[in-house]
Amino acid sequence: MKLTCVLIIAVLFLIVCQLNTADDSRDKQEYRAVRLRDAIRNSRGSRSCGNLGESCSAHRCCPGLMCMGEASICIPY
């Protein structure tokens, strides 16, 4: 009997949490495409040059940086 009550309370608690989360995120999907575009634009694979401290073995360093060292990382001139 106690186990049944605990299970019922746990299920009700989880349902309330899901409903509360779904209600909070209802209006935030409006700009989803913009966030996705920005994430793709800023991803490591889409950049054409490496920033300070990044590896330059797969791509060239950004302007003002040069590839140097055994680890092949981008450093300032």
Swiss-Prot record:
Keyword S-adenosyl-L-methionine: no
rRNA-binding keyword on record: no
Main subcellular location: secreted
Endpoints of the signal sequence: 1-22
Disulfide bonds: C49-C62, C56-C67, C61-C74
MF terms (GO), sorted A to Z: ion channel inhibitor activity; toxin activity
Proregion residues excised on maturation: 23-47
Alphabetical list of InterPro entries matching this protein: Conotoxin (IPR004214)
Keywords: Disulfide bond, Knottin, Neurotoxin, Secreted, Signal, Toxin
Subcellular localization: Secreted
Entry remark concerning the domains of this protein: The presence of a 'disulfide through disulfide knot' structurally defines this protein as a knottin. The cysteine framework is VI/VII (C-C-CC-C-C).
Family: Belongs to the conotoxin O1 superfamily.
Protein's name in the database: Conotoxin ArMKLT2-0322
Annotated source species: Conus arenatus (Sand-dusted cone)
